[in-house]
């Protein structure tokens, strides 16, 4: 392992007000009850990459060296999967919200899925624009089934490379060694989302200044190797293992040296997801 120093994607913000999320009723939908998502629409879908590297001085946040490596790796990976990739750099929180709102209003009826990758500083439930924080829920809510009807019943993948707190994982040594007769045409508005977080709740997320973040490196490598062979959750399990076993932080600050990381997958997918068909 090359001893280039690792960084974290975190910025502590005090006195954030909690958001109250009101429930919503299900909506009518002609969803098929097959076990896997239909991925043979005319288009695979959009892949939006928001790559925030440089932040306003007023935020006190440092530049995220290595993030351009992640963005380039992601562009190549998802283009190879036939996604239409749109890369946006250094967006303010207002620009992030505006972009996500506009994308959600597009006609996705000929698209199989939707992918959004967020590369930035973060905290639990928060991603940072270049000038301040955005509630992740505010971003993802635009794509709920009752608000983005052309993506209803289709997989919506949010990949988030950012810290979720300030805890450090020191690691530990180990010894190796739906029924057909359910004619339901309503689905929950929060169904068919998947959130792939780079780290567990409350923890730092590591990024190498030369090679990019551990999580994005691993995600792209596993997609390139297995996207034509394995179901997506199986691929993400391999990503978890790669990050957990092959990476360890190197820092001249002893507090941040020899630390570990484990990604966290939160799935509300209702079917298996294969990128091939």
Curated annotation (Swiss-Prot):
Q: Please describe what this protein does.
A: Thiol protease that acts as a major effector caspase involved in the execution phase of apoptosis. Following cleavage and activation by initiator caspases (CASP8, CASP9 and/or CASP10), mediates execution of apoptosis by catalyzing cleavage of many proteins. At the onset of apoptosis, it proteolytically cleaves poly(ADP-ribose) polymerase PARP1 at a '216-Asp-|-Gly-217' bond. Cleaves and activates sterol regulatory element binding proteins (SREBPs) between the basic helix-loop-helix leucine zipper domain and the membrane attachment domain.
- Name of this protein: Caspase-3
Q: Which UniProt keywords apply?
A: Acetylation, Apoptosis, Cytoplasm, Hydrolase, Phosphoprotein, Protease, S-nitrosylation, Thiol protease, Ubl conjugation, Zymogen
A Gene Ontology biological process noted in the UniProt record is:
response to estradiol
Which InterPro entries does the record associate with it? Caspase-like_dom_sf, Caspase_cys_AS, Caspase_his_AS, Pept_C14, Pept_C14_caspase, Pept_C14_p10, Pept_C14_p20, Pept_C14A
- The main enzyme category here is hydrolase
Q: Tell me what organism the protein belongs to.
A: Homo sapiens
Compartments (UniProt record): Cytoplasm
Q: Describe the effect of residue 207 to A.
A: Abolished ADP-riboxanation by C.violaceum CopC
* Residue positions where N6-acetyllysine is found in the record: 11
Active site residues per record: 121, 163
Q: PTM (Microbial infection) ADP-riboxanated arginine: at which residues?
A: 207
Expression sites by tissue: Highly expressed in lung, spleen, heart, liver and kidney. Moderate levels in brain and skeletal muscle, and low in testis. Also found in many cell lines, highest expression in cells of the immune system.
Chief location of this protein within or outside the cell? cytoplasm
MF GO annotations: aspartic-type endopeptidase activity; cyclin-dependent protein serine/threonine kinase inhibitor activity; cysteine-type endopeptidase activity; death receptor binding; enzyme activator activity; peptidase activity; phospholipase A2 activator activity; protease binding
Q: Which residues make up the pro-peptide?
A: 1-9, 10-28
